[in-house]
């Protein structure tokens, strides 16, 4: 069976991930007019820039959908977002600022839940608005086939007939008007935006040029913290975790995790927390650039890692960072539910997150400027009295440290011998100044 259909399957049911925007509206109407039977599925991901979800399925029906459904994905999305925080599943960082993989998390949830809904309706052909140059086409492909082994893929943007007729936004808008729909294109922005309740992605168009900065972006989850005319009040916030799960903000508990994430977004958003500018490697190995918002994820991540460093030992923390980066890359590639990802998730959630219980108080200022004011946990292995520089009872004595240092003589001797060996082979040169060997100029060494 052919998995990817290059041309419209006339007379067959096609499920389309319907956003209500111009692209998917024109695609749905075009498919109906050409003889297919489109079904529209809209994911409620708590997008901060969406005002009326209920209106989206109604529009789909007007444009010719056989049926239109709104699928509430918010609870599952937040669950996956918290899992990513517990595992540190983030691999793209620049200058200490993190991209929280909010779009890949959204695709994992959308790609599975919408296809599951389609399968229930007897719809086994799926289309969405992802382009062939991006990451989403592969993410949706993987998650769709994982959910429904009989799934076939039809994307209007891979169909030359569709492209020839409606290859651009102007053509799509004219097509909608000619078909009797008073569809006006939204004002053209200098970049495109995709969002869910975990975060927002701004990319493409002007942002493809590195001399266009964050300053051209209008945040949808926070404030323009770089603009001195925007007033930002210093704010203290306390975040509490129990067994790796965020449970309270400023002492307030929440009926569900969705409400907690929304409040975390509001708190972090007041400061522009979690906004970053990243150059990343797409799945196809080409580099792209994005500007990201994730105020709630950033707030929870900061508090979580503060507790992590105070509770776990050095090697566990090292494994958390190493495995977290691996897992973040798998998530980015659309492999969040693959066995290798599940193995890493299980280890990190079972042995790392389960011990993270406590409370962290932060002072938030502008953007990513913050201070940690207090850290409280019954599980802390950090004990001030163990290494206090003040006089008092100590867990070990000066004689104990002398013995420990004496044991170091073994590896110091080995290291010194190796350094002299490197001098003999020409990799290092002896120094007449400070007595330490010096690395030879590589070009000079090659000529030897």
UniProtKB/Swiss-Prot annotation:
> Where found?
Cytoplasm
What are the protein's UniProt keywords? Amino-acid biosynthesis, Arginine biosynthesis, ATP-binding, Cytoplasm, Ligase, Nucleotide-binding
Q: Biological process (GO) annotations?
A: argininosuccinate metabolic process; L-arginine biosynthetic process; urea cycle
Top EC category: ligase
Q: Which Gene3D superfamilies does the protein's record reference?
A: 1.10.287.400, Argininosuccinate synthetase, chain A, domain 2, HUPs
For this record, the Gene Ontology CC terms, alphabetical, are:
cytoplasm
Q: Does the keyword Isomerase apply?
A: no
Name its pathway. Amino-acid biosynthesis; L-arginine biosynthesis; L-arginine from L-ornithine and carbamoyl phosphate: step 2/3
Positions of L-citrulline binding: 99, 135, 139, 192, 201, 203, 280
UniProt GO MF annotations: argininosuccinate synthase activity; ATP binding; protein homodimerization activity
Task: Write out the catalysed reaction.
Answer: L-citrulline + L-aspartate + ATP = 2-(N(omega)-L-arginino)succinate + AMP + diphosphate + H(+)
* Residues the entry annotates as binding ATP: 17-25, 43, 129, 131, 136, 194
Its main subcellular localisation, reduced to a broad class, is cytoplasm
Q: What is its EC number?
A: 6.3.4.5
Subunit (UniProt): Homotetramer.
Hey, which family's this protein in? Answer: Belongs to the argininosuccinate synthase family. Type 2 subfamily.
The protein's matches in NCBIfam families, at most eight in alphabetical order, are given as: argG, PRK05370.1
Its name, as the record gives it, is Argininosuccinate synthase
């Amino acid at each position: 069976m052919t998995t990817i259909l290059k041309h419209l399957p006339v007379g067959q049911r096609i499920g389309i991930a319907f956003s209500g925007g111009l692209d998917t509206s024109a695609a749905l109407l075009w498919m109906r007019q050409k003889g297919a039977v489109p079904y529209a599925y809209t994911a409620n991901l708590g997008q901060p820039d969406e005002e009326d979800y209920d209106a989206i399925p109604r529009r789909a029906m007007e444009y010719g959908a056989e049926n239109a459904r709104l699928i509430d994905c918010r609870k599952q999305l937040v669950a996956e977002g918290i899992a990513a925080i517990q595992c540190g599943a983030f691999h793209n960082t620049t200058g200490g600022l993190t991209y929280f993989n909010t779009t890949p998390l959204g695709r994992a949830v959308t790609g599975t839940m919408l296809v599951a809904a389609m399968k229930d309706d007897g719809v086994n052909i799926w289309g969405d608005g992802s382009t062939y140059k991006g990451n989403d086409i592969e993410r949706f492909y993987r998650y769709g086939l994982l959910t429904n082994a009989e799934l076939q893929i039809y994307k209007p943007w891979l169909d030359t007939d569709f492209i020839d007729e409606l290859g651009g936004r102007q053509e799509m808008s004219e097509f909608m008007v000619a078909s009797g729909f008073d569809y006006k294109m939204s004002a053209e922005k200098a970049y495109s935006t995709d969002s869910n309740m975990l975060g927002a992605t701004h990319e493409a168009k002007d942002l493809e040029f590195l001399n266009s900065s964050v300053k051209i972006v209008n945040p949808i989850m926070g404030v323009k913290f770089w603009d001195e005319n925007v007033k930002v009040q210093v704010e203290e916030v306390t975040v509490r975790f129990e067994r790796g799960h965020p449970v309270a903000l400023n002492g307030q508990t929440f009926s569900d995790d969705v409400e907690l994430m929304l409040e975390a977004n509001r708190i972090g958003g007041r400061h522009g927390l979690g906004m970053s500018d990243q150059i990343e490697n797409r799945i196809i190995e080409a580099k792209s650039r994005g500007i990201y918002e994730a105020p709630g994820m950033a707030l929870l991540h900061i508090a979580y890692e503060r507790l992590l460093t105070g509770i776990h030992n050095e090697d566990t923390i090292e494994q958390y960072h190493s495995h977290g980066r691996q897992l973040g890359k798998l998530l980015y590639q659309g492999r969040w539910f693959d066995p290798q990802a599940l193995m890493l998730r299980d280890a990190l959630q079972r042995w790392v997150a389960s011990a993270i219980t406590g409370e962290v108080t932060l002072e938030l200022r502008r953007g990513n400027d913050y201070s940690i004011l207090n850290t409280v946990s019954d599980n802390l292995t950090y004990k001030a009295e163990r290494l206090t520089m003040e006089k008092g009872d100590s867990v070990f004595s000066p004689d104990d440290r002398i013995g420990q240092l004496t044991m170091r003589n073994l590896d110091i001797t080995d290291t010194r011998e190796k350094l002299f060996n490197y001098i003999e082979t020409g990799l290092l040169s002896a120094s007449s100044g400070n007595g330490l060997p010096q690395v030879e100029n590589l070009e000079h060494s090659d000529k030897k």
